[in-house]
Regions:
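Predominantly a Rossmann-like dinucleotide-binding segment in NAD(P)-dependent oxidoreductases
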Residues: 94-171, 175-178, 296
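NAD(P)-binding Rossmann-fold cofactor-contacting core
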Residues: 1-14
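Beta-loop-alpha module in the N-terminal Rossmann-like domain of NAD(P)-dependent dehydrogenases
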Residues: 7, 18-80
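Hydrophobic residues in well-ordered beta-strands that form the structural core
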Residues: 24, 63, 88-90, 199, ...
């Protein structure tokens, strides 16, 4: 079943090739006992209320990122899933990219030594084509520039690699876009491990994506040629004290892989690769970044 209160004009053409029942109300899906899980891909500000409704109806939940807009909201959703014995999936598909799976392997095996710095920039100008009143440009549903679009993926990877955060400083700015949209967000995150995570995401410049992790025994860098939906290859470079290794990975359908991993967890075939603590921690960091941008880049402590 598909639910959309305002479906696009070409929805019937799509349904001719991919038949499914269309409803205008989420309640129809929640009351259908045949439905075991619900995927939420709605404006971010609606996530928490809808997620809790899905769990209360006895369904497994897959929610597009960010899970919620606040850390308290994330706690409520994670706790509700845990109490109900349901599997919580989140749309952080970058962990499923072959290059980032290799990065996680290198870090977990100690190939980079102690992680010192994680530095990333993921930017694109897709938002130039959006109408001014699009919710993706709204400070209520999408605060701090591109934080909810791409920044939240980077912080997810940071947390996976370095653990929980201790302090956040962040700034956003508007030099080109007209209000309420913002041109970029840049954040500096101190982790409890002592590592630093720094990232920038611009919403006004052509595509660029680089993710680099530096350790005392080596560094690894991932360069993407295009956004995940474009099917372009990604290049990984690993340098240690013995030399340089470069690997080119062809694109894979990471969105589907994430859905399949969630479905496998629902069926008890495997554990989902995201922990509740990681999902909650990412929203704590997201909330702190938003707070810092709204307070001229002042430090926000995470306890």
């Amino acid at each position: 079943m598909g639910v959309d209160p305002t479906p696009p004009a070409d929805i019937e053409d799509f349904r001719q090739h991919h038949p499914f029942k269309l409803s205008h109300s989420l309640d129809d899906a929640l009351s259908d006992r045949r439905i075991e899980g619900v995927v939420l891909a709605t404006p971010h500000a609606l996530h928490e209320q809808q997620a809790l409704s899905v769990i209360a109806a006895g369904k497994n939940l897959f929610c597009e990122k960010p899970l919620t807009m606040t850390s308290e909201g994330a706690k409520r959703v994670v706790s509700a899933c845990r109490r109900a014995g349901k599997v919580l999936g989140v749309g952080h598909e970058r962990r499923f990219e072959p290059a980032f799976e290799e990065v996680q392997k290198l870090v977990s095996e100690g190939a980079l030594g102690k992680i010192l710095l994680m530095d990333a920039n993921v930017s694109h100008d897709n938002f130039r084509r959006l109408a001014k009143d699009n919710w993706r440009l709204s400070p209520e549903s999408a605060p701090a520039g591109m934080m909810t679009a791409v920044g939240i993926h980077m912080t997810d990877l940071f947390i996976k690699l370095a653990g929980p955060a201790q302090e956040v400083r962040a700034r956003s700015a508007r030099l080109i876009f007209q209000p309420p949209a913002e041109d970029f967000v840049s954040a500096n995150i101190l982790f409890k491990s002592g590592a630093i995570g720094a990232f920038t995401a611009l919403s006004i410049t052509p595509f660029y994506a680089r993710f680099t992790i530096y350790g005392d025994a080596g560094w690894v860098e991932v360069m993407s040629k295009a956004n995940v939906d474009q099917g372009k290859p990604t290049t990984l470079t690993h340098v240690d004290h013995e030399g340089r290794r470069t690997v080119v990975y062809e694109a894979t359908d990471t969105v589907t892989q994430n859905f399949e991993a969630w479905a496998d967890a629902v069926e008890g075939k495997a554990s989902y690769r995201f922990t509740d603590d990681e999902l909650s921690e990412n929203i704590r960091v997201f909330e702190a970044i938003v707070k810092s941008t709204r307070n001229n880049g002042s430090a926000v402590a995470l306890r």
